[in-house]
Amino acid sequence: MTTPGPMEAAAMAGARWPVSVKGVLGWDGRIVVLRNHRGEWELPGGRLESADKSPQDALRREINEEIGLDAEIGPLVDSWIYDVEGKLVLILTYACEAPQPEALSHSDEHTDVRLVTPAELADAPIPSGYLSSVETALAGC
C-alpha cells in the first residue's frame, strides 16, 4: 500500500480547501507582480469571501484592493494546488485587462509591486504555478 500524497490525505480527512483567485495583468509584455510577507512574488488577487458572487467578482475586488485598478476579468487560464506552509490552497488564475496607470501602488498586504518580464520571473522567488499561469495566459490560453 502506498502512502497518500498531501492532496489525497486532505481529501480523505474531509478537508475543505481555501480558494484563491489570481490575475495575469500587464502591459507591453510586462506582468504585475506583488511581493508578499513571505518574500515571494505573486500575481494580484486573493481569497474568495462569502459576499463574492463569483470567482471573477472576487478577483475584481481583490485587484482593486491590492493595486487600485478596475480590471476586466477574462477567461480562466489555469488552476493548480499550492502548499502554503502545510496548507493546501486551490489557485484559479484568470487573464485580466485594465488601463495602464501612470504608476503602480500596492496595499499594506504586500511590500512591493513591480512590472516584470516573464524572463525576469524565471529567476525570482515565485511559486512555479504562477509561472505556468503567466506562460499560459501570454500564449492566449
Q: Model-flagged regions — what are they?
A:
Residues 1-22:
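Acidic, metal-coordinating catalytic segment for phosphate/diphosphate chemistry
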Residues 23, 76, 94-96:
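A structural signal for short, well-ordered beta-strand segments
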Residues 25, 33, 96-98, 115:
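Conserved hydrophobic "DFG−1" position in protein kinase catalytic cores
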Residues 27-65:
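Conserved Nudix-box catalytic region and its N-terminal flanking loop in Nudix hydrolases
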Residues 69-79:
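A short coil-to-beta-strand element that immediately follows conserved catalytic motifs
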Residues 80-103:
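Active-site-adjacent beta-strand/loop module that shapes the phosphate/pyrophosphate-binding cleft
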Residues 95, 105-137:
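NUDIX/MutT-family hydrolases
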